Structures are given as structure tokens and as C-alpha cells.
Amino acid sequence: MEPACKYDFATSVLFTEAELHTRMRGVAQRIADDYSNCNLKPLENPLVIVSVLKGSFVFTADMVRILGDFGVPTRVEFLRASSYGHDTKSCGRVDVKADGLCDIRGKHVLVLEDILDTALTLREVVDSLKKSEPASIKTLVAIDKPGGRKIPFTAEYVVADVPNVFVVGYGLDYDQSYREVRDVVILKPSVYETWGKELERRKAAGEAKR
């Protein structure tokens, strides 16, 4: 019999923060090896990290420091992209906002995403960035959910795989909540079912979302 989950909103913990960090160090070693001939240097030629907000902020903060442990200099940039609303499934529409991104022409770019699910968001992000003609562009995802694909896409680097369930924690959210949870957990269906009904009730009553 499995022990009870320590989170009352989750059915189980898939990966603890410590387990993720161990896996991230393994990925960082691979990245350091793969870019060893790219002459990466602070200021002159850092690896440009493009973090996809909002979900990747926790992952990015940890990953760039771990990359630093392996001698990989980085510059961090952010863009906003989303294909989820209040639901647990992608709505299929991708909104990418990359205003203010540095000039990546001729630079080595590594896109960091919290979760690779349908692949619609990451495909749109990569295609958008390629227009700026970087020297190279690769993707690193904290969580890969292969069962959720709507289009073919393979990330060059993956920290952990999960089954086709809805997960939160370590920056991953459900309707902007649960990002602060340190571990990656499976959200109880009762949570999003109840909240979905509440949103419908408020909509019908003409109430603003709190």
C-alpha cells in the first residue's frame, strides 16, 4: 500500500525537488559537453537562455545556477507564451510575446520550458526565434508528457517524463495556483472539477473571477 500523499490537493508525488535537481545536474553535464566547442564566454558569448514564462521561472532559476556549476556561462532572457486557460488541457491557441528579447542573431540559444505537452507552445516559440537567425537553438524541458502531443516534437534535453496526467508544482500551475509547491505532483481531479464548476457558476451569475 502506497503512503498517503503529503499534499491534500494531490494524488501522488511524481518527483521531489531533490530528485529533479539530481536529474538536472545530469542534464547540465550533457549540455556542458555538447557546447564545449562553442567558445562560450561570459559577456562575449554566453549561452542565451530563453525562459518561457510564467511556468519556467523556478526551473530557470535553478538550472542556470546548476549550469554555472558545470562552467556554462549564461545570459537569461524571458518571453511569454501560453496555450492554457482555466482548463487542464491546451486550448490550441498559442500566444507568444517576445518583446524586449535581446538580439540572438549568431548566438547559441537554449529555450527552457516547464512542460512539453501538446508541443504547440514550444513549436511556436522555436519557430519564432529561428526568424532571428541564431547560431543554434535547442530546447530543454523540465517535464515531458509524451502522451499529450498534438504535433511531433522532441526536446534535445529532458529532465523528467510523466504520464498523461495533469501535474502542478515546481513552477507548474493550475489556473495560476500551486506554482510554489516544491515537488511535481498529480493534481486531484476533484480540484479542477470543483473549480471549473465554480467558475461556471460565477460566469452565469455575472461575477468577476476572484
UniProtKB/Swiss-Prot annotation:
Q: Where does Mg(2+) bind?
A: D173
- Cofactor(s) needed: Mg(2+)
Q: Which residues form the active site?
A: D117
Extract the InterPro entries matched here. Answer: HGPRT (IPR050408), Hxn_phspho_trans (IPR005904), PRibTrfase_dom (IPR000836), PRTase-like (IPR029057)
The record's GO CC annotations read: ciliary plasm; cytoplasm; cytosol; glycosome; nuclear lumen
Q: Which CDD domains match?
A: PRTases_typeI (cd06223)
Q: Which GO terms describe its biological process?
A: GMP salvage; guanine salvage; hypoxanthine metabolic process; IMP salvage; purine ribonucleoside salvage
Reactions catalysed: IMP + diphosphate = hypoxanthine + 5-phospho-alpha-D-ribose 1-diphosphate; GMP + diphosphate = guanine + 5-phospho-alpha-D-ribose 1-diphosphate
EC number(s): the record gives 2.4.2.8
- Cite the Gene3D superfamilies for this sequence: 3.40.50.2020
Residues spanning the signal sequence: none
Which pathway does the UniProt entry assign to this protein?
A: Purine metabolism; IMP biosynthesis via salvage pathway; IMP from hypoxanthine: step 1/1
Q: Give the principal location in a single coarse category.
A: cytoplasm
Enzyme superclass (EC): transferase
Provide this UniProt record's keywords sorted from A to Z. Answer: Cytoplasm, Glycosyltransferase, Magnesium, Metal-binding, Nucleotide-binding, Purine salvage, Transferase
What are the protein's GO molecular function terms?
guanine phosphoribosyltransferase activity; hypoxanthine phosphoribosyltransferase activity; magnesium ion binding; nucleotide binding
Note how many cofactor molecules are bound and how.
Binds 2 magnesium ions per subunit. The magnesium ions are essentially bound to the substrate and have few direct interactions with the protein.
Q: Where in the cell is it found?
A: Cytoplasm
Q: Where does GMP bind?
A: K54, E113, D114, I115, L116, D117, T118, A119, L120, T121, K145, D173
User: Main role?
Assistant: Converts guanine to guanosine monophosphate, and hypoxanthine to inosine monophosphate. Transfers the 5-phosphoribosyl group from 5-phosphoribosylpyrophosphate onto the purine. Plays a central role in the generation of purine nucleotides through the purine salvage pathway.
Q: Which family does it belong to?
A: Belongs to the purine/pyrimidine phosphoribosyltransferase family.
Listed name of the protein: Hypoxanthine-guanine phosphoribosyltransferase
Q: Which gene codes for it?
A: HGPRT
